[in-house]
Each structure stands twice: as structure tokens, then as C-alpha cells.
């Protein structure tokens, strides 16, 4: 069976799963509880909802002014086999954000926040670095992502658990992938 773009879309699932696996393995080897290592806990519902609404507004306003999302063209979805659509959404909209947030707002934020840089430095470094890993985007889009990274970092600091930035990032990518 020949499915166009299967390999590329399969990698969108495999790579985040590998990153998540490495984070989990590192926590187990170092015997660190998830709450300590990456801030895994249930966030305060009202605060998480507030951050999600703020982030949704950032997404919509930034897209209104920069039109980074592009046109609402569903041709690619109609023409692709269902497995490709499932892999694309799973990889880009769910697993990718989980992996990136575990690394940036989980491990890196947690480590930098405990240094002389403090929380502000941790938020700035993770936001700028996260924007930089999207180097294939336009400079304006990278700047937009750095701003998004600051919001993700602020949400991590204000609500404590990493779940809030993960949900925010998933929201962004769901909007972007469609």
C-alpha cells in the first residue's frame, strides 16, 4: 500500500514520542518525581482557563494582523488518506506541543528558574530559544513565537504546573494545523 507522505507524517508522531520518552527516562534514572522535575500537576482550573482565553486572544489577534495561519483551505485534508490526517493532528497538534513544553517549560524553565537568572531569566531564555528552534519560519513569525513563548512561560510561573502551557500550546497548534 502506497500512502503519500506517510513517512513524513509518521515522523511527526515518532519524534515527539522519542522526546517525551527521553524526558520520562531521565526522570526515572534520576529518580525525580514528575512534579519536581517538570512541574506535572493539576493546574488551578480558573487560572488555567484564564490563560487559555488570553492565549486564544493572542492567537486570533496575531493572525488578524500577520495572517500567519494562511487561508482556510481544507483541500489537503480531503485529498489525504485518513491515516495521514490522524498522524498530522496527533503529531503536530498533540504530541509535538507536549514534547516541546516538557523540554522548554518543564526541564529548562525548572533548571534556569533555580539559578541566578531566576524566573524572569528562565522565561526569557526559554521563550527566545523556543522561538529560535522555529528558524524555518519568517522573522515576523519567529518574533510572534517568542511572544507566545513569553506567555507560555508566564503561565507556567503563575499556575505552577506545566499542564497549562501544554494546553495553551496544543490550542495554538490545533489552530495552526487546520
Give the positions of each predicted feature:
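Structural signal for the C-terminal ends of transmembrane alpha-helices
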Residues: 24-34, 155-158
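Alpha-helical transmembrane segments in multi-pass membrane proteins
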Residues: 1-30
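Juxtamembrane helix-loop-helix connectors linking adjacent transmembrane helices
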Residues: 2-9, 32-96, 110, 114
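Short linear motifs at secondary-structure transitions and domain/linker junctions
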Residues: 12-14, 26-28, 65-73, 105, ...
Amino acid at each position: 500500500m502506497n500512502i503519500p507522505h506517510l513517512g513524513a507524517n509518521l515522523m511527526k508522531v515518532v519524534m515527539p514520542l522519542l522526546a517525551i520518552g527521553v524526558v520520562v527516562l531521565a526522570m526515572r534514572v534520576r529518580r525525580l518525581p514528575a512534579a519536581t522535575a517538570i512541574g506535572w500537576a493539576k493546574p488551578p482550573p480558573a487560572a488555567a482557563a484564564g490563560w487559555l482565553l488570553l492565549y486564544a486572544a493572542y492567537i486570533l489577534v496575531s493572525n488578524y494582523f500577520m495572517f500567519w495561519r494562511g487561508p482556510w483551505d481544507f483541500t489537503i485534508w480531503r485529498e489525504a488518506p485518513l491515516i495521514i490526517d490522524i498522524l498530522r493532528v496527533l503529531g503536530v497538534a498533540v504530541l509535538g506541543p507536549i514534547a516541546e513544553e516538557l523540554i522548554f517549560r518543564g526541564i529548562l524553565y525548572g533548571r534556569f528558574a533555580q539559578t541566578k537568572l531566576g524566573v524572569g531569566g528562565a522565561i526569557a531564555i526559554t521563550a527566545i530559544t523556543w522561538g529560535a528552534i522555529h528558524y524555518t519560519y519568517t522573522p515576523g513569525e519567529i518574533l510572534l513565537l517568542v511572544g507566545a513563548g513569553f506567555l507560555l512561560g508566564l503561565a507556567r510561573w503563575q499556575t505552577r504546573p506545566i499542564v497549562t502551557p501544554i494546553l495553551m500550546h496544543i490550542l495554538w497548534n490545533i489552530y495552526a494545523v487546520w
